[in-house]
Amino acid sequence: MKVSVLITLAVLGVMFVWASAAELEERGSDQRDSPAWLKSMERIFQSGERECRKMFGGCSVDSDCCAHLGCKPTLKYCAWDGTFGK
């Protein structure tokens, strides 16, 4: 019973890797998409407002932090709140 479960998991893992490789080959390299992704991340962390606290800056409430950052309650620092976009 244990052996059949392990074999099933191994087959599923191989199928996942195979499907991922086929999709990557079909779609092409991610290197073309990387610069756009990096520029969008730069816009998130280099916002025009400089009145706010940057990443890992001290804070007391969420409004102290820049966009897409939130004040962590335990150590009182600005960290990413998990959002993207404007």
Curated annotation (Swiss-Prot):
Sequence positions bearing Phenylalanine amide: F84
Propeptide section residues: 22-50
Region forming the signal peptide: 1-21
Main subcellular localisation: secreted
UniProt keyword annotations, A-Z: Amidation, Disulfide bond, Ion channel impairing toxin, Knottin, Neurotoxin, Potassium channel impairing toxin, Secreted, Signal, Toxin, Voltage-gated potassium channel impairing toxin, Voltage-gated sodium channel impairing toxin
Any single GO CC term annotated in Swiss-Prot or TrEMBL for this entry: extracellular region
Expressed in which tissues: Expressed by the venom gland.
Localization (cell): Secreted
One Pfam short name: Toxin_12
GO molecular-function terms, A-Z: ion channel inhibitor activity; potassium channel regulator activity; sodium channel regulator activity; toxin activity
Residue pairs linked by disulfide bridges in the UniProt entry: C52-C66, C59-C71, C65-C78
Site (Involved in active face): W80
Domain of life: Eukaryota
Residue segments, region Involved in active face: 55-56
UniProt-listed InterPro entries: Huwentoxin-1
UniProt comment concerning the protein's domains: The presence of a 'disulfide through disulfide knot' structurally defines this protein as a knottin.
Misc remark: Negative results: does not show effect on Kv1.1/KCNA1, Kv1.2/KCNA2, Kv1.3/KCNA3, Kv1.4/KCNA4, Kv3.1/KCNC1 (all expressed in oocytes), voltage-gated sodium channels (Nav1/SCN) (from DRG neurons), and in a range of voltage-gated calcium channels (expressed in rat DRG neurons). Does not show significant toxic symptoms when injected into mice and into cockroaches.
Function summary: This toxin acts as a voltage-dependent gating-modifier. It inhibits the sodium conductance (IC(50)=124 nM) and slows the fast inactivation (EC(50)=1180 nM) of Nav1.5/SCN5A. It significantly shifts the activation to more depolarized voltages and decreases the deactivation of Nav1.5 currents upon extreme depolarization, but only slightly affects voltage-dependence of steady-state inactivation. In addition, this toxin causes an approximately five-fold decrease in the rate of recovery from inactivation and an approximately 1.9-fold reduction in the closed-state inactivation rate.
Family: Belongs to the neurotoxin 10 (Hwtx-1) family. 28 (Jztx-11) subfamily.
Record protein name field: Kappa-theraphotoxin-Cg1a 1
Organism: Chilobrachys guangxiensis (Chinese earth tiger tarantula)
